[in-house]
Amino acid sequence: MRILLILAVLVILLSGCAATDSALPVNTLRQIPREERVPLMVLNFKNSSLKNSANEYQPWEFGIPSMIMTDLESIGLFNILSWERLKDISAQLKFQYQGMVDEDQAVEVGRLAAARFLLTGNFMIIRQTLRIEVKVFSVESGIQIGASAVTGKIDQFFELEKKLVIGMTAYLGTVLTVDEKSRLLQNVETTSIDASLNNYAGEVALRKADQLKVQGRKDLAKELIQQAQAKFEKALEHDPNYQRAKKNLAGLAMAVPMTL
């Protein structure tokens, strides 16, 4: 049963919690060789919003950890566990998804992935106020070593996420300089809520399409890919300069058409 719970973490992650390698930045604040960086895993963030707003902001269960991973990668101190690595672990286990998981199982997955730190959290939106909480675990000891939280107006989500990243870095064994903090705060994906939600809804759709293709359900996968394209286009309507959405849309355009 424990292994099944461990696999559940992997399935949740594979369905929408890890940023794609292509979405991660190339330029970093610190020039540390890749082999010397700290391995780190970021799990999904639970949407704890009230029912009337939960569905609207559901894409941020994927989006917030993706933004966090992008910012942590941009520091140049961490190796973020990739989606492909999680698929490798899942293939090695060869079990089926059942039930929900707790933090103990999540830490166990971190060990399998050879991560040093594990991040998980949740967010809540009430009356246009956004609160994001994150917990930091040491995979080696299996205990929580820190926590951080930010609260503010939802239209400042991009600033809140970056403040959260800055707040958690101390638990990850580093302290950013004033200049590094300033540069991190200035590197904003988008300031548009609608653009962000549409983009990450598209990314979630692509993840689900990948799973369907593996299952041989190509017709449904094609529908999801078309939905993803529409979401990326909608994101760019809200923010024409949204580089992540542009890359996602360009990736679809360059992809080899599915043979049905």
Name the predicted role of every residue range.
Residues 1-4:
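Positively charged n-region of N-terminal signal peptides that target proteins for export
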Residues 6-15:
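Bacterial N-terminal signal peptides
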Residues 96-141, 207, 243, 247-252, ...:
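Surface-exposed short loop/turn segments
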Residues 53-65, 83, 99-103, 112, ...:
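Solvent-exposed, acidic/flexible segments
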Residues 17-38, 129, 140-260:
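C-terminal/domain-edge helix-coil "capping" segments
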Residues 29-103, 119, 123-127:
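Short beta-strand->alpha-helix linker/helix-N-cap micro-motif
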Residues 60, 64, 68, 77, ...:
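Stable alpha-helical elements in mature extracytoplasmic
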Residues 49, 68, 72, 76, ...:
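Sec/Tat-exported extracytoplasmic proteins
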